[in-house]
From Swiss-Prot:
UniProt source species: Streptococcus pneumoniae serotype 4 (strain ATCC BAA-334 / TIGR4)
PROSITE patterns: MGS
Gene Ontology MF: a single term: phosphoribosylaminoimidazolecarboxamide formyltransferase activity
Name of the protein in its database record: Bifunctional purine biosynthesis protein PurH
Pathway: Purine metabolism; IMP biosynthesis via de novo pathway; 5-formamido-1-(5-phospho-D-ribosyl)imidazole-4-carboxamide from 5-amino-1-(5-phospho-D-ribosyl)imidazole-4-carboxamide (10-formyl THF route): step 1/1; Purine metabolism; IMP biosynthesis via de novo pathway; IMP from 5-formamido-1-(5-phospho-D-ribosyl)imidazole-4-carboxamide: step 1/1
Domain MGS-like: start-end pairs: 1-145
Keywords, comma-separated and alphabetical: Hydrolase, Multifunctional enzyme, Purine biosynthesis, Transferase
Length: 515
C-alpha cells in the first residue's frame, strides 16, 4: 500500500528537499496552499488538499483541513478493525506522516506595527488540529513539527521503510510541547490585550537558550530558558563578545547587576556584584572615575565578581579593569581599543554587550519565584520615589551633601539582601551589611567594612529599625545621617535616639525587602 504524507508548512526551509526524498521512497504527497505551490514549482508532484476532502478551501484559507477525510486518515487506529472498516466505508484513505508547522503568530506580534487584526489572523487552527491528531495516534503516524527532525525521519524511512515507535513517541511529545507553547503565547497576548492582571490560569512560554554544565552546585542539573517574547534589556538578550559560556551562577548574578544599574540612569555608574549582592557602586562624571569608585568601595570582594557599566567602556577604563580578576563585564558598548585590551589579556573573561535603551520596558515584567508545589508571582520593586515625598523626622535637617548621599544610598539599598544595611557617601558605597538575621548585626557589618571612611558617610536600611539600638550603633560609629522606611511601633524611640546624638533621619515610607 502506498504511504501518504500531508505537508503544510509556513517555514519552508528544507521542505523541498525533504519532499523530493520522500518521492524517491515512493510516498504520495498531499499539500495545501503555498506549500503546494512551492513543491509544484520545484517539480514535486502533489495532491491538492481539496482533492482529498472533496471540498474547496474557503474563507481565505481558514477552512481547508478541518475535514473527516483528513482527521479520519490521521486518527484511525491501524490495530482496530472497526476503525479500518469505518475508514473504508467512508472512503477515507490513511495518512502515515504529517509535516506541519504553524502560522507565525510569535513573529507577527513582535512586529512594531502589528495590529490586533493581524495577530488574530495569524492564529493557526487547522495546523494544531492536524498535529494533535497525528500525535495522539503516534502508534501509527509520524508527526514532524520541526525541520531539524527531517533528517532522522528520512534516515529511518530509507533504512526500515518506517520510523521506530521510539522516534514517533519522541516526535509526538515535541508536538504537544509545541502546540501547548503556541497556545500559551496566544493566551498571554490576549490576556495582555484585555488587561487581565490576575488570570485564573497562568501559562508561560520559554525556549531553551542554553544547556548548562550544572546548576548552582555541580550536583545540580540546570538549563537556561528565554522568554518566547524576549525582553530586550535582560541577561538573556545580552550579546556575548568573549569568554566561556555563562554558568548558572553567572546568569543569576548578571541579572541582579543589570537590575541595579537601571536605577542609576542619570550619571556614569559602575556596579560590582558578588553572590547577588552589590559589593561596590561608583558614580561620577565619567565612566573611568566611576570604575575607580566602585573598585575602591571593596577591592577585596570585587575579586571574581561581576561588573556592569552604564556607559561605553573606553581604553583607559579597560586598562584598569584588566588588572582585576573578574568573571563578567557588561556594558552597552566598547571601543575597539577597549575590547582589544580586554580580550587580548583575558581570554576567558566573559564580555557582554547589552544596550541600555530598553530598561523601562524591562521593569514591567513580572517576577516569578518557584516554591515546592507552586509559583509566586509579583511585580518588580520599581516604585517611583521622590525625595519630595520623604519626611525628615529629626530635629536636624540633612545638609545638601547629606541629602545627595542619602538619595544615592536609598537607590543602592534596594538591592542588598535583607536584613540589608548600606553605608555610602554621595558617589560610592563604603560598606555593605547583607543578609543578617537581625538588623543590628547588619549595621555592625556595614560599619566595620566602611571602617576609617565614615567621615561624611550616611547609612540606609531596607526596612525599619525595630529598636533604638541600631541608632545607638550608628551614632557610636560617627555616622550623622540615616535613611529608612519607618513604620515600626517603636519609631519614636529611634527618633529620640537620633535627636540625642544630633543625627538627621529620613523616613521614606517605602520598604525594600529582598530575599
Amino acid at each position: 500500500m502506498t504511504k501518504r504524507v500531508l505537508i503544510s508548512v509556513s517555514d519552508k526551509a528544507g521542505i523541498v528537499e525533504f519532499a523530493q526524498e520522500l518521492k524517491k521512497l515512493g510516498w504520495e504527497i498531499i499539500s495545501t496552499g503555498g506549500t503546494k505551490v512551492a513543491l509544484d514549482n520545484a517539480g514535486v508532484d502533489t495532491i491538492a488538499i481539496d482533492d482529498v476532502t472533496g471540498f474547496p478551501e474557503m474563507m481565505d484559507g481558514r477552512v481547508k483541513t478541518l475535514h473527516p477525510n483528513i482527521h479520519g486518515g490521521l486518527l484511525a487506529r491501524r490495530d482496530l478493525d472497526s476503525h479500518l472498516e469505518a475508514a473504508k466505508d467512508n472512503k477515507i484513505e490513511l495518512i502515515d506522516l504529517v509535516v506541519v508547522n504553524l502560522y507565525p503568530f510569535k513573529e507577527t506580534i513582535l512586529k512594531p506595527d502589528v495590529t490586533y487584526a493581524d495577530a488574530v489572523e495569524n492564529i493557526d487552527i487547522g495546523g494544531p488540529s492536524m498535529l494533535r491528531s497525528a500525535a495522539k495516534n503516534h502508534a501509527s503516524v509520524t508527526v514532524v513539527v520541526d525541520p531539524a527532525d527531517y533528517a532522522v525521519v528520512l534516515d529511518e524511512l530509507a533504512a526500515n521503510g518506517e520510523t521506530s515507535y521510539e522516534t514517533r513517541q519522541r516526535l509526538a511529545a515535541k508536538v504537544f510541547r509545541h502546540t501547548a507553547a503556541y497556545d500559551a503565547l496566544i493566551a498571554e497576548y490576549f490576556t495582555a490585550q484585555v488587561g487581565e492582571s490576575k488570570p485564573e490560569k497562568l501559562t508561560l512560554t520559554y525556549d531553551l537558550k542554553q544547556p548548562m554544565r550544572y546548576g548552582e552546585n555541580p550536583q545540580q542539573d540546570a538549563d537556561f530558558y528565554q522568554k518566547a517574547l524576549p525582553t530586550d534589556y535582560s541577561i538573556a538578550s545580552a550579546k556575548q563578545l568573549n569568554g566561556k559560556e555563562l554558568s548558572f551562577n553567572n546568569i543569576r548574578d548578571a541579572d541582579a547587576a543589570i537590575r541595579i544599574i537601571r536605577d542609576f540612569k542619570d550619571s556614569p555608574t559602575v556596579v560590582a556584584l558578588k553572590h547577588m549582592n552589590p559589593c561596590g557602586i561608583g558614580q561620577a562624571d565619567d565612566i573611568e572615575t566611576a570604575w575607580d569608585y566602585a573598585y575602591e568601595s571593596d577591592p577585596v570582594s570585587i575579586f571574581g565578581g561581576i561588573v556592569v557599566l552604564n556607559r561605553e567602556v573606553d581604553a583607559a577604563t579597560a586598562e584598569k579593569m584588566h588588572g582585576v580578576f573578574l568573571e563578567i563585564i557588561i556594558a552597552p558598548s566598547y571601543t575597539d581599543e577597549a575590547l582589544a585590551i580586554l580580550i587580548n589579556k583575558k581570554k576567558n573573561l566573559r564580555i557582554l554587550a547589552l544596550p541600555f535603551n530598553a530598561q523601562e520596558a524591562s521593569e514591567v515584567e513580572a517576577e516569578y519565584t518557584g516554591v515546592v508545589g507552586g509559583l509566586l508571582v509579583q511585580n518588580q520593586d520599581v516604585v517611583k520615589e521622590s525625595p519630595a515625598d520623604w519626611q525628615v523626622v529629626t530635629k536636624r535637617q540633612p545638609t545638601e551633601t547629606e541629602a545627595t548621599a542619602l538619595e544615592f544610598a536609598w537607590k543602592a539599598i534596594k538591592y542588598v539582601k535583607s536584613n540589608g544595611i548600606i553605608v555610602t557617601n554621595d558617589h560610592m558605597t563604603l560598606g555593605v551589611g547583607p543578609g543578617q538575621t537581625n538588623r543590628v548585626a547588619s549595621v555592625r557589618l556595614a560599619i566595620d567594612q566602611a571602617k576609617d571612611r565614615l567621615d561624611g558617610a550616611v547609612l540606609a536600611s531596607d526596612a525599619f529599625f525595630p529598636f533604638a539600638d541600631n541608632v545607638e550603633e550608628i551614632a557610636k560609629a560617627g555616622i550623622k545621617a540615616i535613611i529608612q522606611p519607618g513604620g515600626s511601633v517603636r519609631d519614636q524611640e529611634s527618633i529620640e535616639a537620633a535627636d540625642k546624638y544630633g543625627l538627621t533621619m529620613v523616613f521614606t515610607g517605602v520598604r525594600h525587602f529582598r530575599h
